[in-house]
Amino acid sequence: MKCPKCGSLNDKVLETRQSKEGVVIKRRRECLNCGYRFTTYERIEEEHIEVIKKNNTVEPFNKEKIIRGILLASKNRPITQEQIKQIADDIEKYLLDEGKLKVSSAEIGDLVKNRLKELDPVSYLRFVSVFDGFEDIKDFEEFIKSFEKKI
């Protein structure tokens, strides 16, 4: 570790302690060049998911956007806030577990659709109609016909 006083890279660790929560390691170090003592902290760097939008811009993953989208689609439907939050948490966990740190908004939308399809067909239809950009009643009719064939 580089000494903040003299810039030397030679140091020794005098003491190591783990935080009560177990998420941070604190190390007391001493520079072997100038004798200066300093503290460093070590923590796990969280991975951040990036979302590639339809227009190819990239933005940080925002679980709240999933929650808002599902809330709109499930308004006045028998879906609880806890279920909605769980869907968003599950999607984030899935992406991290699979190592998908760059993911398209379309893939996230598909993950939401799959969960809503299982949970509530009306909320699913509402979500799909907005996400897929239905323009008129024909889009709904075609979707419902294809949906009924799959059931």
Curated annotation (Swiss-Prot):
This is Transcriptional repressor NrdR. GO terms for molecular function: ATP binding; DNA binding; zinc ion binding. PROSITE patterns: ATP_CONE. It comes from Sulfurihydrogenibium sp. (strain YO3AOP1). The lineage of its organism: Bacteria, Pseudomonadati, Aquificota, Aquificia, Aquificales. Negatively regulates transcription of bacterial ribonucleotide reductase nrd genes and operons by binding to NrdR-boxes. Its cofactor is Zn(2+). Signal peptide: none annotated. Residues 49-139 form the ATP-cone domain. Pfam families: ATP-cone, Zn_ribbon_NrdR. Belongs to the NrdR family. The gene is nrdR. Binds 1 zinc ion. PANTHER family: TRANSCRIPTIONAL REPRESSOR NRDR. Disulfide bonds: none annotated. A zinc finger (unnamed) spans 3-34.
